[in-house]
Amino acid sequence: MNLVQSLSDLGVTNQTINSDQRQRLDTDGFIILPNVLKAKSLDLVRSQLERLYEKEGPGAGIEVHQESGARRLSDLVNKGEVFDQIYTNPRVLACIHHVIGREFKLSSLNARDALPGQGLQGLHADWGKDYDGSFHVCNSIWLLDDFSHDNGCTRLVPGSHKKRLPSKALDDPMKKHPNEEYVIAPAGSVAVFNSHTWHGGTKNTSTNLTRRAIHCYYTARENQQQLNQQEYLRYETFKRLSPAARYILDVDTN
């Protein structure tokens, strides 16, 4: 198994994304894919997340990251078959392949829900070094609620994926950037972005709105994963996965 075979087996072709989408990824560093998760899948994913939040309680998200002011979950690969469709989606994989441009793998599969009155993040990039001519990471935000200015939508700065890190380039990454754009889209959409792009969550200014999302994060295959999938993978998870899905996780033992 290799990446080309894995992507083919998962339904990725040269026509999975179009030239305009590729251009947006190259120029802006992000695109929004509409209607990726249908209503039934949305309901199933939301229900499983809520079960996990209740089950894991204060320990939720501890495998990767916990955040004050947000509900977090980590290691979703092992926490429900309903999540398999997330990291194996052909439209998203085609975008990831276009951005990274070489062999890649899943880095982590996590969830985040910024609570009312919380959620503001400074602009940041997910790769901790300045652009060196290659792209090493690419992320996707799966919207499980409608994203709006009210519930803390994500902000991104188009074209920033080839710039220095925002911590170096900006006086205050917490402030609004004059060029920032917002992920305003209905539930079921997926925002795919080159993770070198400056981005961050905005404040959930509502009193009662959820802002649930799954972060499906990929990295070039030579890099370490945010969560070591080989180390964490449960046997029952491994058994149900296709060889192509195992390859994306980098748990293929062949």
Describe each model-derived feature in a short phrase.
Residues V36, H196-T197:
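Short, surface-exposed secondary-structure boundary micro-motifs
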